[in-house]
Amino acid sequence: MRIKYIHFIKYRYYSYVISIILILLSAFSLYTRGLNLGLDFTGGTMLEVRFQTPVSVKQVDDALYKVNIKDAVVQRTNTGDIIVKIRVGEKPSLVEKALNSIGSFQLLQREDIGSVVSGELRKKAVWAIITALVGILIYLSFRYEFLFALGGILALAHDVFIVVGAYSWTYKEVSLDVLASILVVAGYSITDTVVVFDRIRENLKLRKGMDLSEIINLSVNQNIVRTIMTSSTVFLSSLGLYLFGGNVLSDISFAFLIGVVVGTLSSIFVASALVLDIKILLKKIKKQKPQSI
């Protein structure tokens, strides 16, 4: 597979505009809608039931509404069972009463999570993300000069924020499993970026007279086929899980679907371009400083 040489740096401002738009859309959605946090983070009760005769999600929603349970999450599994999730403060007995009004059913599973436990999980989730980002920054700082580490961590934060924003826009449930998948996406994204950075570092040693922008163009072009092939494989695998994996795997694989696309684009158009523009900015600042007499 051969691809024509592309001047990626030439088009970096277009990628910046797209990235800024996606970040603003994500921020707007997070501010106005927030996230559909699962019971792991909010506390509550999950009931999984099997009706003797098939019922629709709308029937269950309507029955719950009649007993004044308006914020329940109702899902259908691949096997036709119904999952009902209610927040802390709602009574499971009312849910069973509502379900009984529809028809006979068998309770397959019940899971209760207290508000104290969910609060601790929220704190741990935030610290997990912060620790991961700081750890990656330290790793990149040791492996490369700080300029590359900064560009890599900014691109990574960009990827994670857009993935979280996608969950807000679609209002898909965010559980501990989803959080784990987002951290996996972060690892995949930074690995993709590191491959490009390695090639840039190698070319800087081999082609010392070449401008940094040309070095970046050359390095990205040398890796583009590998990046596309790897990303396509992960994307297609994630798509299969999303389409045929059921509700739980669907929510998890959604992070991979969005993360692979955003991470691939950022490793090609954003991370290395940020390194170049930060370096240019620092040079301008240095020139503007008054020289000491």
Segments the model singles out, each with a brief description of its role:
Residues 1-293:
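A structural signal for conserved, well-ordered secondary-structure elements
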